[in-house]
Every structure is written in structure tokens, then in C-alpha cells.
Amino acid sequence: MNYQQQLANSAAIRAEIQRFESVHPNIYSIYELLERVEEPVLQNQIREHVIAIEDAFVNSQEWTLSRSVPELKVGIVGNLASGKSALVHRYLTGTYVQEESPEGGRFKKEIVVDGQSYLLLIRDEGGPPEAQFAMWVDAVIFVFSLEDEISFQTVYHYYSRMANYRNTSEIPLVLVGTQDAISSANPRVIDDARARKLSNDLKRCTYYETCATYGLNVERVFQDVAQKIVATRKKQQLSIGPCKSLPNSPSHSSVCSAQVSAVHISQTSNGGGSLSDYSSSVPSTPSTSQKELRIDVPPTANTPTPVRKQSKRRSNLFTSRKGSDPDKEKKGLESRADSIGSGRAIPIKQGMLLKRSGKSLNKEWKKKYVTLCDNGVLTYHPSLHDYMQNVHGKEIDLLRTTVKVPGKRPPRATSACAPISSPKTNGLSKDMSSLHISPNSGNVTSASGSQMASGISLVSFNSRPDGMHQRSYSVSSADQWSEATVIANSAISSDTGLGDSVCSSPSISSTTSPKLDPPPSPHANRKKHRRKKSTSNFKADGLSGTAEEQEENFEFIIVSLTGQTWHFEATTYEERDAWVQAIESQILASLQSCESSKNKSRLTSQSEAMALQSIRNMRGNSHCVDCETQNPNWASLNLGALMCIECSGIHRNLGTHLSRVRSLDLDDWPVELIKVMSSIGNELANSVWEESSQGRTKPSVDSTREEKERWIRAKYEQKLFLAPLPCTELSLGQHLLRATADEDLRTAILLLAHGSRDEVNETCGEGDGRTALHLACRKGNVVLAQLLIWYGVDVTARDAHGNTALAYARQASSQECIDVLLQYGCPDERFVLMATPNLSRRNNNRNNSSGRVPTII
């Protein structure tokens, strides 16, 4: 390394240390300012948020992720008109957002290349590439808009800037032309020949044309760039020769890639990226090549530019787990069953425990009210009062975790082998030939062939007393080390030694060394802000001398696959073991139900194709519901109508409360959604939404996007063309009950379009208590049940006898209604349905206008 390179590295290291050390003084200043807040409730709430921010900063990936977790660093550059922010947003969330982010952003996502999981770091640069950016990236994506000449020329400029800082032959490059802004008003100006020439000028890089509006080639771009990085690393590794550890090349050891059904990863904005947090909508086009983990990736403190936008675009991928805004949670999740609050799952175990904060340099403990539910989620709140009020709560999804007790073998674990530890593998044996994991079923067997009937085995590993590290303290020897419990549910096969590739996740490698008394914190003033647990049971030399002294801690640790740890402590030995056993049972139950939970009611490929064709064959579905474009391939679920791709983009912008958009070709279609679409169709939908168009001209195929958007907003948002309500003395809610009882779909759709949430939830009467959802489920009508749920009916409502709609669905033996109700959080209570009188009318004539209220007979 030459002298200039050494100076550059030294300067970069000093700058990073200065940045890192500047965070805590600012946080401590906030703690001091909090003392001036007179309102105690507000003060505590702000303090909890600051603590959470501090925890997230301290537990960033550089301190928590195992060295065996490989990273791929992708930089994205382009000017404000290039469409790069929409490209990134579509890849992360599956949705389209037109707004461009001037400051760029930092995002994380898991991506799978050749069966190997990688942490993909995406850096959306807010300006031209600088030296720090150029030296950081493993690959670069240059983005321009096909309708903007300036963005096209900017790529040449940015490429020249990159070449000044780094040899571009060292890194893969990808060129992307975006089609998002192309319209009749903005025609395409960059033809294919010019784009191909640019790709040749950029050292013959791969060229893609993408459309973030409907996802064309978006996944393919990122998958391709990831594969190029991996291939480049392998080529470099071969040219260097066999090497166990290469700087900045963490792909030398594999990670246990658990093939679990899709779980959410948090793409967090590191350093003020524009995706600041995520709501609850599910992406419409999920990737089959990427797995998403249900974990929050902590942000770092770098800021791309000093100028921040006042309003950040919010992604549709995530929901905050803090529970600090119950109204938003209720609105966003529609009272799902596993939420915390009224109607949530009943805890199978609960009580007060001590929890250690996530700080690595001190042992600070606080009392938490902890609950464990049978849905595989452990929650903790600062107090019982907060739990009852559903505020300040945090969740731990136990699906990808393990639980361990320092110095004690978990009671459910069985010894399968006695591996020889190594400092590089944190106590895991390199000779694992006695362990076999079948390639398909996920079963784990030991040398003796012991195997659980469920296909999941618990295997413990004893580690030898070699030198190991924990919490930055070095220990040379110890009498016994703790055993890590491994719960294997991935499709991995190995009949030979697995070496470093054996599940090198923190759930295995995180062993616990003897307790040490930490050195005094350099920030002593912080102790007055947070309660610190007594460490009087430790010896002066920092080591607990006997097993009895270790046992007095009554501590257990939950470790996630990504390295997050949660330390809890009970008051007695029995209480701790009870918690550990209950948590292990829920981990096992979550793994066993993992496969079955994703196997919802799905049609086979052939029957699904026939079902989708039946949707296209509905009257009016050969043309777009709003502009008459032929052969529409996009659907609005709650409207029951088909539309063209341009109108679907406008419908997305209306919001899911008005239109739930889904692709016929790209998305999954459960049975209940197919039935909704097969029951309505464009002709029926327009008979409701366009009956009173009053001679206004409907947009045509050649109409501009602006004309189509004006029509669509007037039609669905302002409801200017909506058919009038039927003439009747009944209230809208009572009329909806009658239409549901009669299974009159058109009338029900019309009433739902006119009605409010309160009217949709109107009941048959004080002595009855049934809502329209009860009546729909009693009839086994999944179409009406699904529509009512989308329009805001309370799925947890009970009739006068305490029966939910689920009880009526079970009585009607309607599995489709049962599945829909459970999906939206209806309490799963198997009570015997108490008889409730039928809802009928005294006059069977549907056109009866006597206005008689539905009668209970």
C-alpha cells in the first residue's frame, strides 16, 4: 500500500470515529433537555423513543451481524428526472410512487443468489458520484429516463466522474432506461439505438428498460447486478488463490439459507433516506427470488446531503411495531388477530421480567411486562398499564429465533455431537459429518438417527474451553461454556463436513461467556436517566466462580438469525425455566405451522388459468372499466372490475380504501378473490358507479392520462356518477342488512358505495346484535363477506349471544368464509353457536316499498 493510500485510509478512519463518537453526546443532550419537559407522560414517551433510537444505533450491523453474513453494495446514480427513486421504491415495496427523492436514500434488503442469502445495501445517491461513493460500491446502476434528454446526457457525465475515482473495469455496471414518464404529452426521445450505444460506451454494460408503474424488469435489474457482483468476487478470489478471509469479501463462508415462506424485512432508511418507515400494504408483485425477514435493520447516521425534505414519501411495505399509535394500527391493519389490544390473542404466559437494554458497554436492566401469545409473538411493555392501553409495546417474532440459558443446557435439547471449537467459528465444529439435513423436508437427524415426527429436531452443541469473546472482553479459559440450541427448518443437505457453511447465524454462533463486570462507562451522567441492575453477585475479578452464582441470575437470552439479542431475567429458577420452555414450544409451533400457513386455499395452475379466464369472460370485462381499452389485465378487487395498466396506476393513487389494485398475470389469486371478481364484472360495476354520468363524455383509449385521472377521481373519489339510493323508509344500514340477507349483490354494492363505516356496522336490533357480516357468513356468501370487510365492517363484532361471524361461517360449513375471517383477525373461538332468529321480511316481494324494518321471526 503506497503512502497516499495510507493517508487516505487514515483520514477516512478518523472521520468515521468522529462521526460515531458524535452521536452519544447529542443523545445525552436530549436526555438533559428532557428533564425540562414538565409533562411526565410526554417526557417518558419521548425518552422511550430516544432509547429506541440509541439502541438501534448501537446495534447497527457493524456490531451485530456475523462476519459470515455477506454484503452486496449497490450504488444507483441519475439526475432528478431519471426515475431512479421510483425504480428503488418499486423494488423494495412492489408499489409505484411518482415523487423523486432529491436527497437519495439508504436501504437494505435480502437477496438470494445461487441459493445464498446476501444483505443487499442499496445507496440511492442524491447527486453525482463522489470519491467516497465510488470506493464504497461493489456495482453501479446508471439510470436515465427515456423521455428526458438531459438525464441521458447526465449518465455520460456521472460515468466520467466515477472513472476519475475508480477503475470502472473493477466493478460491474448496469444501464437502466425508465419508461415511467412516457406519455402522449411526453413522448420517448431516446431510441433503442442510442441507448445501446451508451451501454457500449460504458464498457459494454448490460442495458435494461424498466417501468416502475407495473414492475417491468425491476426485479431483474437488481437480481442481475447481484449476480454480477458475486461472479466478480469469485473471479477475484480465484485469481488471488485460496484464502480463508478476504477484506471486503464476506462471501467466503456460506449462510444457512432457511427456505421459510416470505417474511418481511425492514428496508430502513440509513441516514435520512426517503423511505422513512413503512405501512402495512403488501407488495402486489412479490419476488420469488428474494426472501424477506421480519426484522428491523438499524439505521446509521450518515446523511447524503445536508438539506432535508420536509415531507418524506412513505413506503407501503412496513408497519411500525412500536404500538405508539393505536388508531393508526387499527386503521392500517384492520384489527388483525395478533395485534396488541382489544380483540388480540390471549397470552399463554405473562408476567414481569427484567430486560437488559441493547447497550454493549453496560448492564442496564428495566422491568418489563412480558406476554407470550400462541401466534408465536413475544411482546414486552414498560408496565402492565401500557400493555392494557396498547402503547409503548415491542414485539419479537419467534419464528427465526432460538432461546438459550447461560451455563445451562436447554431442557428440550439433545446432544448430537461434541464438536471441537474454533475462535473463527465461535465454538462450532468444522466436522459435522454426523449431522444430516434432508434436502427437501427440512428434517434434522443426528448420528443415532433420532428424529422428531414433525421434521424438526433440536440439536445442541458443546464447545470446548478455547478462548472466545463476548461483549468485547477476552476470556482465556472457563470450565464450561453454554450450549446453543439450533432449530433447523431449512432445506439444507450435507453428508460431509459442512465447515463454515453450517448455519453460521447468530442463533448458533452466539455463545455466552462467563459474566464480567464491565468497566465504568465514560458517560456517567447517563445513569441518572436509566435504571441500572445491581451487579453485586459478581466477584471482584469479574468472573462468577460457581454454577450456583451463575444460576442466581435466572437469565435467558433470545437470539435471532440476524444477530439481535434480547436478554431477560426472571426472579426464580422455576420461573425462568417455565419461560424458556414456553418460548421453545412457541418456536417449534411456529416452525411446524410455517409451511401450512403459506399454503392457503390456492387453485392449481390449470384451474387457476380457467378461473382467470372466467373473470375475463364476465360481461364488460373485455374493455377497461374506465377508458374502454381492450383486453385489460389489471383488476380492482373491491370494485370487481378490470382496467388497463394506465388506469390501474391512477387507481393505485386513489388509495386502497377506494380501489385495491391487483394484476391478473403477476399476482396470486386466492379463491375468495376470484369469486369476488367472477361475481361482479365491469358491466355491473358501471351500472352502480356510472349510472348518473349525466351525459359527460367518458375517456377513450386515446385520451390523455390527465383526462382519465379527472374522470376516475370524479367517478370513485367524488362519487359524482354514483347511482342514487333506492326509495325506502329504511335506513341505509337496515337496507344493507336486508340486501345481505337476500344476497342481492348489486344493491349491496350500491349501499356500500354510499355508506359510512358506522352504517356498514349497523346491527339488526338491540336484542339481536348481528351485523351484515354475520348474515353473509350464515349464508356462506364469501363475496359479500369479503366486500363488507373491505368497506370497514367490524370482524370482531358479536351478536347478542356473543357469537362472532366465524361461528356462523362454521355453522354454514363455509371454509372460504372461515379463511377470510381468520385472515382479517376474527377471534377464533370454537363456541357452540347459540340460536339467533332468522332475519327475513314479511313480504317476499323484493320491490316492496312499504319501508318495513327487517323483522326477526
From Swiss-Prot:
Q: Whom does it interact with, and what assembly results?
A: Homodimer. Interacts with several subunits of the AP-3 protein complex: AP3M1, AP3S1 and AP3S2. Interacts with GUCY1A3 and GUCY1B3.
Instruction: Please list the residues that carry the modification N-acetylmethionine.
Output: M1
Q: Which family does it belong to?
A: Belongs to the centaurin gamma-like family.
Bias-annotated ranges (Polar residues)? 422-449
User: Which positions fall inside the Arf-GAP domain?
Assistant: 609-729
Q: Where is the composition biased (Basic residues)?
A: 524-534
Q: Where are the zinc fingers (C4-type)?
A: 624-647
* Free-text function comment from the UniProt entry: GTPase-activating protein for ARF1 and, to a lesser extent, ARF5. Directly and specifically regulates the adapter protein 3 (AP-3)-dependent trafficking of proteins in the endosomal-lysosomal system.
Impact of altering R652K? Answer: Loss of GAP activity. No effect on AP-3-binding
Q: In which tissues is it expressed?
A: Widely expressed.
Biased composition, class Low complexity, residue ranges: 275-289, 504-514
| InterPro entries linked to this entry | Ankyrin_rpt (IPR002110), Ankyrin_rpt-contain_sf (IPR036770), Arf-GAP_GTPase_ANK_PH (IPR051282), ARFGAP/RecO (IPR037278), ArfGAP_dom (IPR001164), ArfGAP_dom_sf (IPR038508), P-loop_NTPase (IPR027417), PH-like_dom_sf (IPR011993)
Region named Small GTPase-like: 66-276
| Chain positions with Phosphothreonine modification | T836
> According to the UniProt entry, how is activity regulated?
GAP activity stimulated by phosphatidylinositol 3,4,5-trisphosphate (PIP3) and, to a lesser extent, by phosphatidylinositol 4,5-bisphosphate (PIP2). Phosphatidic acid potentiates PIP2 stimulation.
Q: Which consequence is recorded for altering C647S? A: Loss of GAP activity
GO BP terms, alphabetized: protein transport; regulation of modification of postsynaptic structure
Q: Which gene encodes it?
A: AGAP1
- GO MF terms on file? GTP binding; GTPase activator activity; GTPase activity; phospholipid binding; zinc ion binding
Where does this protein have compositionally biased stretches of type Basic and acidic residues? 322-337
Q: How is it modified after translation?
A: Phosphorylated on tyrosines.
Note the segments forming the ANK repeats. Answer: 768-797, 801-830
Report what the protein is called.
Answer: Arf-GAP with GTPase, ANK repeat and PH domain-containing protein 1
Write down the species: Homo sapiens
Q: Which SMART domains match?
A: ANK, ArfGap, PH, RAB, RAS
